[in-house]
Design a protein with these regions (language model features):
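C-terminal interaction module
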Residues: 1-45, 49, 148-166
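Structural alpha-beta junctions
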Residues: 35-42, 125-140
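Short, well-ordered, mixed-charge alpha-helical segments that flank or form enzyme active sites
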Residues: 114-118, 147-150
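Intrinsically disordered, low-complexity boundary segments flanking structured domains
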Residues: 1, 63-67, 127
Length: 166
């Protein structure tokens, strides 16, 4: 997984007040990853952040995936990863408790993927499609190196000004 020391990636963060742990949202999320193929199609997934995620990601894992997606845990994170052609990591935080305010989708794409404007457009289209599925209330796309040179992108959840869309 990417560490705080790595700066060579673009991050996408989508936050929503919509509860994501519903079956139809999990199915739409799964279908979106399959539809985009290429770099956005994970090779592996898991419910814990491990050096090597244990479960393969393909059409046959849908029942197991939906079972984990809808499991009534107070707070869970699902992790997805792909190593080639460029590293990418995705995660979904699903909170189901009284004080829950936001559920979150995050993506970290290594900068080596962005060789032309075609990859940038693909990222924007993927982000738009994911925001429609998650019902994103706000989100951001930022290059980690630039964010560190300036200041962190802050969000409305932190009640501070930042670069975001609503």
């Amino acid at each position: 997984m990417f560490t705080d020391k790595d700066q060579n990636f673009v991050k996408v963060e989508l936050d929503t007040t919509l509860f994501l742990g519903r079956k139809h949202i999990g199915e739409e999320f799964f279908d979106l990853l399959l539809r985009y193929e290429g770099i956005y199609l994970p090779e592996r997934w898991d419910t814990e952040d491990r050096a090597r995620l244990r479960r393969s990601f393909d059409r046959s894992c849908l029942p197991e995936f939906i079972e984990e997606w809808t499991r009534a845990d107070e707070w869970k994170t699902l992790f997805f990863t792909r190593k080639r052609p460029s590293p990418i990591e995705l995660s979904v935080d699903i909170q189901r408790h009284e004080g829950a305010k936001f559920n979150e989708f995050s993506a970290y794409i290594h900068e080596s993927h962005f060789k032309s404007t075609a990859q940038e457009k693909e990222l924007l289209n993927f982000t738009i499609d994911m925001s429609l599925i998650t019902g994103a209330d706000y989100g951001l796309i930022a290059h980690r190196r630039q964010e560190r040179r300036q200041s962190p992108v802050l969000t409305p959840a932190e009640r501070l000004p930042g670069i975001y869309w609503a």
